[in-house]
């Protein structure tokens, strides 16, 4: 029964604590959108290199 007040106080402290990112951003952080664009460009380049005949669908840029 002695632990209950301590538990309640801890819950109140946790609930009132400001939400802060656990890991602050650094200058090396990269947004995911450009990374996704780079992956798409790389995949398109690889598709073009794999295609060896001009009549195949992958060569038409689709």
From Swiss-Prot:
UniProt-annotated location(s): Secreted
Residues making up the signal peptide according to the UniProt record: 1-22
Posttranslational mods: Contains 2 disulfide bonds. Contains 2 disulfide bonds that can be either 'C1-C3, C2-C4' or 'C1-C4, C2-C3', since these disulfide connectivities have been observed for conotoxins with cysteine framework V (for examples, see AC P0DQQ7 and AC P81755)..
Keyword annotations: Amidation, Cleavage on pair of basic residues, Disulfide bond, Oxidation, Secreted, Signal, Toxin
Main location: secreted
GO cellular component: extracellular region
Residues carrying Serine amide: 60
GO MF annotation: an example: toxin activity
InterPro entries: T-conotoxin
The organism's place on the tree of life at top rank: Eukaryota
Tissue specificity remark: Expressed by the venom duct. Is mostly present in part 5 of the venom duct (distal part near the pharynx), and less abundantly present in part 4 of the venom duct.
Proregion residues excised on maturation: 23-47
Residues recorded as bearing Methionine sulfoxide in the entry: 55
Record text about domains: The cysteine framework is V (CC-CC).
Family, as annotated: Belongs to the conotoxin T superfamily.
Name of the protein in question: Conotoxin TeAr151
UniProt source species: Conus textile (Cloth-of-gold cone)
